[in-house]
Structure formats: C-alpha cells, structure tokens
Amino acid sequence: MLVRLTKLSCPAYHWFHALKIKKCLPLCAPRCSSTSAVPQITTHYTVHPREKDKRWEGVNMERFAEEADVVIVGAGPAGLSAAIRLKQLAAEQGKDIRVCLVEKAAQIGAHTLSGACLDPAAFKELFPDWKEKGAPLNTPVTEDRFAILTEKHRIPVPILPGLPMNNHGNYIVRLGHLVSWMGEQAEALGVEVYPGYAAAEVLYHEDGSVKGIATNDVGIQKDGAPKTTFERGLELHAKVTVFAEGCHGHLAKQLYKKFDLRASCDAQTYGIGLKELWIIDEKKWKPGRVDHTVGWPLDRHTYGGSFLYHLNEGEPLVAVGFVVGLDYQNPYLSPFREFQRWKHHPSIQPTLEGGKRIAYGARALNEGGLQSIPKLTFPGGLLIGCSPGFMNVPKIKGTHTAMKSGSLAAESIFKQLTSENLQSKTTGLHVTEYEDNLKQSWVWKELHAVRNIRPSCHGILGVYGGMIYTGIFYWILRGMEPWTLKHKGSDSDQLKPAKDCTPIEYPKPDGQISFDLLSSVALSGTNHEHDQPAHLTLKDDSIPVNRNLSIYDGPEQRFCPAGVYEFVPLEQGDGFRLQINAQNCVHCKTCDIKDPSQNINWVVPEGGGGPAYNGM
C-alpha cells in the first residue's frame, strides 16, 4: 500500500505559490522549532535496544544456525557471478562446496534496476555457451548517439572510436530479466538461493573475523513490540562471507568502520538513477538505438545526464532514464522532477507521445571510480560488485565490472578453500589474493584509465570542463596522465543552506509525458508489511526539523524519489514534524547518502518487501 502525499507536506509549497518569485527569503521561524516535545519517529530496535524494553521480557531470542562454506549476500550480477563461478570450479575439480545466497527481494531480479547497456565481456567469460543456454541478450546495439541539450535544442556530439561511451558490440538488456536467468543457472549448478531473506546483521568470531550473517527478525509491530507471530532471524555461518549488496549496502557500511576499509581512499560519490519503461508507437521504435544526453535541464555544475534505449523485446519498448550526481548543491533540486521535466525536451517528447508508461523505479549508483574503492578484503569476508563500487562512470556501465569482480572473488575463494596447506591466522578466512587478482585484471586497468573524468567536472566549467578534459587528456593519453584528481568530499556535505540558493519552480506534470510522484511509485510494485517499524531509522528524531528543515528547507522531501519523507504540521502547537512513509520506499538508498546531517540510517525491512520490478 502506498501512502498518499499531501501538499501540506512541503512547507515551501505555500511559500512558493504565495510569492511567485525565484528568490530565496529568510526561513520562517514556525517551521524550524516548536515548544512541544519532539514526536517519536524511530521505533526500530537498532536504535531502541530490546534488552531495555519490558515488552520483550520472556520472548525467546534464540536463533537457528546453518553452516556453509560460502555465504553470499545479494543476488545481483556480482553475487550471482560469484556463486556460479564457485560451483563451476567445484564441478570441474570434483569438490563439494556448499554455497548459500540470500536476497532481500521476494524474487531474484525484483530489486534490480539499471539502464542497461551491457558490455558482455565478463558475461561471455562466465557463460561461453550463453547463446545455447538462451540468455536474454536480445538487443545488440545498432545505433549510438550522444548529444548536449539546451532548453530548446539538441547539439549532436560525435562518438569517436576508443572513447569510453562507445557502445559498439554491447547489448541493451532488461537487467532484472538477465539476473533472473542467472539465478536459474545458479540453482541448476547447486547454489542454494534464498529470496525473501534480508541479511540484517554481520556476525563475528571471538577473534574479530567475520563469522557470517543473520537475517532479520519478523513479526514486530510498528511501535516496536513483538507480535504473536514473532520469529527470530536465521544465522548463516561460513568460512567466507561475500558481500554483494549493491550500491551503499547497509552491512558494508558497518564493515567499513569495523575494519577501517576506507582509510586509504577518497569518499565515495554517488548518483541517483531514475528509470521508466514505455511502450511507444511502433513507427517511432528503433530497436538497438542508444541515446545519451547531458546538459538541460541541469546546470553545468550539476553532474548528470539521460539515456533512452530502444529494446527488441517483441513489442515497441523503450527504457528512459535520468541520472543526477548526488554531489549537487541546491537543496531545492528534485531529481524526480528534473527527470519529468527532461522528458518534455523537443528531442525527447516526440518519441514518447502517444505511448504508455508501464514501469518506474530508482536506485543510487556509485560514481567515485578508482579513487573511491575501499580495501576489499578482511578476515572472514570480502566485497564485490557495486558494494565497493566498480562502475565505469564515463562508460555509464558497471554490470560487467561487477560480474568480473564476482568471478575473480570466486576463483580466489575456491583456491583457498581447497588448498591442502590451508593456513589462516583467523577463524574466518582472509582471502587477500582476491584484491591482488582484481588489481591485475582488466577491471582495474579500465577504471584506472578513466579515473580523472568524473572529478574533472568539479572545476569552474563543471560538466563541460569534464567533457573538455575527456576530449583532450583521455583522447591523447588514454588515462596515462601522471596525476590522479581527487573528489571533493562526501555528497552529504555538498548542500548549501537554503537561504543561499534559488528555489526551483517545476512545471506541473501533464499526466501524459510527465507524472506525479505517487502514480510513479505505484508502477514500481512497491509493497511492505505496514505493521512493522520503519526501516528508515533516525539517530535523533529532532534533527529533521531542527536542522534539516531549518537550514536546508527539508531536502529529504525532494531528494527521495518515492515520497517517503514529508514535513507535516504538528497536531498541536506551531511547527512541523517529519513523517516517514516507509511503505513507499524503493530501496534506492539516496536518503542514507544525501542527508546533510547523516542522521538517516537505512536498514533492511522484513524480507520480501520493497519494489517488485519486472525487468528493470
């Protein structure tokens, strides 16, 4: 069930429409504070321990435990590649290895969202017989176009051979369908795949090495009390635990701190990707065409761009999407509404006119590149795929590097597991060879070559400076320049105070090309058990109003692409309170990344909840 939004949820709504000006005025005191007590928002046990709650006295908290050789968290391209490669090696060498894979989505692929234009290199390495097996690679790229948009015009830019955005030899895919197919291959090889099980906790041995994971408890009321149906989560123990949670994984966040994995790298920087699927007029359908743009409606200092892919899926289907770098500065910016505005560009709207939108979704993505990759291994576990972040940003691709990292991890794990001279200083195996092998692979070479392109957009010319840098230095030196540019810090630190920014007045959606937020989220299939604690937890319930609303005019109500956060009037007294509509959450992780106070902590809801994407 989706939660309907109200115009009162945005204090600035009345402000904009009463004044009808584009100048930021001093913020009004009533929305900054109230004499009444701060309403309790967070009831989750990660913030309010159950040991201190009398309602939990006498509840059986024992957990059942299972043992495996390898446990993998996340059934995306990386996690499935690791599982499949492990079982391939085991079959080749006659070894018996138990591999368990847990996935929080109700079905494999239901939480997967990407463009996606696939570089098939790693996929073909993993499945040399992919054609015979019927892999859903149905749309080879036949036409590749890139352009700069102004408000009214499209300026074509040639894609020269060797530039990272060249898509010759690639395939347009529905990544959710490809992941679902990979899940079938994994199960056929003997991988134990458990959809609907959300990994909620990292378990440790007494020596500090990773022991495995525990899935989350189910049967807890919204107020934090146990239901009569309460069930403790399951523990999965393994010699090696592989974390393939995707971008900004909530367990990876804990591991970064536990093992200081980010001590020698830049802060990760992110983007938010929004996507829709459309069925269009068959006369406008060009199967295999790839379109990318930069520029309007974003200004030059806001990194981002768009894609429009024509799929050959038996019907005139196109994937349209928009990416906004989460290092943007204006708190009034709404990535969702920028996306809706972009579709009205004279070069985009004609393709969609007369068509029907059939799906919507959003997901954060890593943009930090080589400089932001953390240490990948630690006693008992390792990180693969988009969890550490192997996306090639100028290439606009990360699936191929994620898959290769999974395969390399599997090969390193298998070698250590089956070694006759296995020695380990810790109970959980430390597979250090994985990071060494990755740095010697084409993944590292590819990311090293493009390492300076994304941070080159931070200069006075913004995105256009990055394009100039690419055209000169990358074209000539191919990434061999003897310097490495730095990112400018975490995305949460980049917002300016609202008083220093110009409000953005977005056009009203027309219901044909552009749409409102609620009708969009409805197309994601998102659903959560209503009577459970909100999985969007706050470290301090007072901060959203006292700091975020006061200083930044409540940016969470705009950066969330699903209408999860609303500022609504207090029932008693003056001022506002934050309302969290957790049922709407599409698990994109943007709030955890962009919150300027770093007060929001995304944790897993009950397994099986969230979006139900069909081939996104």
Curated annotation (Swiss-Prot):
Q: What protein is this chain from? A: Electron transfer flavoprotein-ubiquinone oxidoreductase, mitochondrial
Q: Read off the lineage from the record.
A: Eukaryota, Metazoa, Chordata, Craniata, Vertebrata
Q: Which UniProt keywords apply?
A: 4Fe-4S, Acetylation, Electron transport, FAD, Flavoprotein, Iron, Iron-sulfur, Membrane, Metal-binding, Mitochondrion, Mitochondrion inner membrane, Oxidoreductase, Phosphoprotein, Transit peptide, Transport, Ubiquinone
Co-factor remark: Binds 1 [4Fe-4S] cluster.
- What's the stated role of this polypeptide? Accepts electrons from ETF and reduces ubiquinone.
Q: Which PANTHER family does the UniProt entry name for this protein?
A: ELECTRON TRANSFER FLAVOPROTEIN-UBIQUINONE OXIDOREDUCTASE, ELECTRON TRANSFER FLAVOPROTEIN-UBIQUINONE OXIDOREDUCTASE, MITOCHONDRIAL
Binding residues annotated for FAD, in chain numbering: 70-84
User: How is the subunit organization of this protein annotated in UniProt?
Assistant: Monomer.
Record flagged with keyword Cytoplasm: no
Q: What are the residue boundaries of the 4Fe-4S ferredoxin-type domain, all occurrences included? A: 576-605
Q: PTM N6-acetyllysine: at which residues?
A: K95, K131, K222, K356, K415
Q: Which organism is it from?
A: Mus musculus (Mouse)
List the InterPro entries hit by this protein, alphabetically. 4Fe4S_Fe-S-bd (IPR017896), ETF-QO (IPR040156), ETF-QO/FixC_UQ-bd (IPR049398), ETF-QO/FixX_C (IPR007859), FAD/NAD-bd_sf (IPR036188)
